[in-house]
Amino acid sequence: MGSRDFSDRTGALMTFHLSETRGEVYEHKEKTGKRPADWLSSIGFLNERCLAAHSAWLTIGEVRALAKAKASISSCPVSNMKLAIGGVAPIPEMIREGVNVTVGTDGSTTNNSLDMFGEMKTLALLQKSSRWDPTVVKAQEALDFATVNAAKALGMQNEIGSIEVGKRADIVIMDGRSPTLRPISLENAVSNVVYSAGRGDVRSVLCFGEVVVRDRVPQNLDIGSVIEDGQRAMEAISANKA
């Protein structure tokens, strides 16, 4: 059974890398005669349960195919720049055509910090710089990519992504006294979060209403033990390679 058939039967989401590098686009076109997104569209694979990671080397036609299928994409700008893929996801065109845009970190080997605050800022700045236009990807749009749009990509927009009556209390509480967030007002709060804040400004975190981080201290794990376990694992891997 193919992945699309399985998804249709179970409602499972489908995530995959799409047009991350120019080389993979050329290789796919040589094999199939079509660019990756065009080919996926032609075989009826794309739908609202698809989340296409990267999507850096897309034509406007492919963007429209994703929009028509109600698919989502997850741009990973820090990883893309670290790997020097050369492409920049056409985010303004995606927004215009109605693609559900999200932002992601990719894996730790190609991103390292996995910092979603840094990812929002980098995405916005990369789009502005590559377009020579400081007005593209506004701060609110960048925040939406990481919250409400991400919830929609997971099919969970009625449960998470925003603070509303009836939704789960998945909440990140920032330290409003942090110098990086000051001065602050209703007018600049979102901009401060996207362009000035970092993960060090997170004070507490709630998941399903349960406080899992309180005053920067994880409540359900021993962070020291986790760090030591990671160190020992790295040393064991290094020893095996020697």
Identify the meaning behind each predicted range.
Residues E20, P77-M81, G107-T109:
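Short, acidic/turn-prone active-site loops that include or flank metal/cofactor-
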Residues I227-A242:
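Short, solvent-exposed cationic patches
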Residues R168-I227:
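C-terminal cap of metal-dependent C-N hydrolases
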Residues M1-S72, A84-V101, G118-K121, N158:
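Histidine/acidic residue-rich metal-binding segments in metalloenzymes
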